[in-house]
Amino acid sequence: MIRLLNNFNFSEIDNADPAQWCRLFQEAAAEFDVLLSDAQLNRFLMYYRELKFWNSRINLIASAESVTDIVIKHFLDSLTLIPCIPFPDGRLIDIGTGGGFPGIPLKIALNSLKVTLLEASRKKVSFLKSLRRVLNLQDMKILNERVEDLITQAPCPNRFDMVVSRAALKLPEYLRFGKELVSSHGVIIAMKGANYQHELEDVNDILEEYGIFLAEVRSLALPCTGDFRAILIFRKSLSRT
């Protein structure tokens, strides 16, 4: 279990002291063995500011969320996936990315990652395209599309090394989509909370039908909040051989 950073208080540094903001964020990320350069830290700070600005116009995150909520529950929560990324320069798709989570934090931390963000909301896509320009992120595609429509395209886009999502998809539905998008050697990563075991029970009977298996479960606690997270890693069954 990850050590909790109960002494961190991001709410005291809301835009007033960018250097301190970056320092504290760097220390928190290091708890997950994520080392960030000054350029990466500045990108996260710019991301935070753009998120706050756009959130006053469109619903990207809850309007009442504090600086601590944004940094911990969105930025750092996304970065917890880094140890689970088997191909740092591979192709990753983020289904229902919303405000860019977890895809954009992963892209900032792993610059060689080739990221595709999938989002059905036009307003959110406008934000994502603006953010891509502001942060000068390369090798990042943004698709204004529903995953249901994407998987029906011909030929089926079975081309991603990693499929991730923080969207509110039930696990059976997410795996149904994920199996159509992931490559034969790739992984489907599900980010879940404390009730993940109940969701696993719902998919036990369909994993064989889908041709996938649960390869690994990683559990951790987010800093400051102590919120429990379970990262479920699925692979295609043929990768066992």
UniProtKB/Swiss-Prot annotation:
InterPro entries in the record: rRNA_ssu_MeTfrase_G, SAM-dependent_MTases_sf
Q: Which GO terms describe its cellular component?
A: cytosol
Q: What is this protein called?
A: Ribosomal RNA small subunit methyltransferase G
The organism is Syntrophus aciditrophicus (strain SB)
| Xref: Gene3D superfamilies | Vaccinia Virus protein VP39
Catalytic activity, as annotated: guanosine(527) in 16S rRNA + S-adenosyl-L-methionine = N(7)-methylguanosine(527) in 16S rRNA + S-adenosyl-L-homocysteine
Q: Please state which protein family the record places this protein in.
A: Belongs to the methyltransferase superfamily. RNA methyltransferase RsmG family.
Keywords for this protein: Cytoplasm, Methyltransferase, rRNA processing, S-adenosyl-L-methionine, Transferase
